[in-house]
Structure formats: C-alpha cells, structure tokens
Amino acid sequence: MLLRFTKMHGLGNDFMVIDLVSQHAHIQPKHAKQWGDRHTGVGFDQLLIVEPPQNPDVDFRYRIFNSDGSEVEQCGNGARCFARFVVDKRLTVKRKIKVETKGGIIELDIRPDGQIRVDMGPPRLVPAEIPFQAEREALSYSLEVDGQQVELAAASMGNPHAVLRVDSVERAPVHELGPKIEHHPRFPQRVNVGFLQVVDRRHARLRVWERGAGETQACGTGACAAAVAAIRQGWMDSPVQIELPGGRLSIEWAGPGQPVMMTGPAVRVFEGQVRL
C-alpha cells in the first residue's frame, strides 16, 4: 500500500510526518530505519506519527521514531511540526491542542504570526526520573569518560539530556564526546548530549548530539534542557534565546516545578508517498 507523508523541518531538524488518523497502517521500527536513510529512503532525523488519542482528555497521540528505528519519548522541534501539520491537514480546527507522547502530555499553541509555542511541562531533575545513576539530585555531576572527569547537568524534558558548558561551540568535541556520553552506563536509556556556550545572560549557543540520530541542526528538547541547566546554575535569566546551527528558539522557565515554554517555527517542505 502507499502511504501519504509530509516532509517538514524545525530549524533544519527534519522530519517525515505520517497521518494515521485518516490513513490506516502498522508502522514498525524497521520502516523508520528504511525510510530514514538519506541515500536510499526519504531521509530524516525523526519520523513523526499522528494517531488518534488513547486518552479522552487529549486531541492526538504523537509517536516519534529516530532514523535508527528506536522509538523515543519526546521531540520538541517535532512537536512544533506536529502542530503545524494537524492544522494544515485540517485534522483539527483548534489553535491550541493537547497531545500525548511517551514522555507525557504537552500543549501546543499555533500563534497568529506562524510561530508555535509548546508547553513542554516541567523538567524532571531527580536522577531516577531522567534516568541517570546518581546518589542524589545536584546542579551538576561528574562523569568519567575515558579516564577523564566531565562536568555536566542532567535533566529530562520527556527524554533524557546531559548538558555540558563549553567556551566555544565551534571547538566543542561534539562528535568525540557525544557518542561516548550517549552510551555511558550511568544513562541506562542512553542520553541526548548538549554542548552549551553562554554568550550573555539572555543568549546562548548550542550544539546537540541526539540519541539515535547523531548531531542535528536543532533539538527543541535539548534547547529546553540547556536553558533549564543555565538558569538553575545562575548563568542565565529567563527568557533565553538559544541559537542552534539551524536557527533560534525562545525558551522561558520560571523555576523548579514550572513548565518550560518553547517558541519557534515549523516549515512544510514537500508532500510524497511511500510504499509500506
């Protein structure tokens, strides 16, 4: 059978989006891996699936697969594209929607200026909830990598993140340290790794090594986790502008227990069909 899909991106973090509300199919990890190949498939960082809700209090179910076939809990840039998709496809007439993910319920607000504001919910900072192996919650942790100690912050934005402060994102060892921290045994579900350069109290630069995808042009949950780490440690004040290789996100966070608000664009690139 042929499935309709839409190619989208949020700041260069690119997605294949499939509507399983009006279409019916059983998509498996092998399909994500096959379609995700940039040489022999469609090519994407993540596959986003729009499904009918299982929870009566939400509008849709939102599933995410990495290009390696792994299903993940959350994707912030994908959430903005999800919102743009369901409105453009007239799957809803609402401008504010709730969706359920493996990482919890998030709220999406499609603004008149075309920007999409996402309520990502409060960050999870308790190590067991990230999950991260540590005796107690702390602002930062020391992780041994190749015999060296690496200082990092850890948080979950529905998916696990480590954040390292660096002097320069250009010189940051993203491709050297990223995969080693991603697979570190103290992160039992692997981890996304952000390399954060604080420019001033309202502006930072960020590169992210994404779990199961490698370095991407942008990572929405990574930007949220980086902002939380920077605000908690007193480096920055909310709201903050996070500059990623693909563009800029605005992040607001009022402190522990409060939701992280992310605002940014979502762009439709093309429509297509793929054989299942």
Curated annotation (Swiss-Prot):
It comes from Stutzerimonas stutzeri (strain A1501) (Pseudomonas stutzeri). The keyword Transmembrane helix does not apply. Substrate binds at residues 13, 46, 66, 76-77, 159, 192, 210-211, 220-221. GO terms for molecular function: diaminopimelate epimerase activity. Catalyzes the stereoinversion of LL-2,6-diaminopimelate (L,L-DAP) to meso-diaminopimelate (meso-DAP), a precursor of L-lysine and an essential component of the bacterial peptidoglycan. This is Diaminopimelate epimerase. It is an enzyme of class 5 (isomerase). The record marks 161, 210 as: Could be important to modulate the pK values of the two catalytic cysteine residues. It comes from the Bacteria. Pathway: Amino-acid biosynthesis; L-lysine biosynthesis via DAP pathway; DL-2,6-diaminopimelate from LL-2,6-diaminopimelate: step 1/1. GO terms for cellular component: cytosol. It catalyses: (2S,6S)-2,6-diaminopimelate = meso-2,6-diaminopimelate. The active site is at residues 75, 219. It is found in: Cytoplasm. SUPFAM superfamilies: Diaminopimelate epimerase-like. Keywords: Amino-acid biosynthesis, Cytoplasm, Isomerase, Lysine biosynthesis.
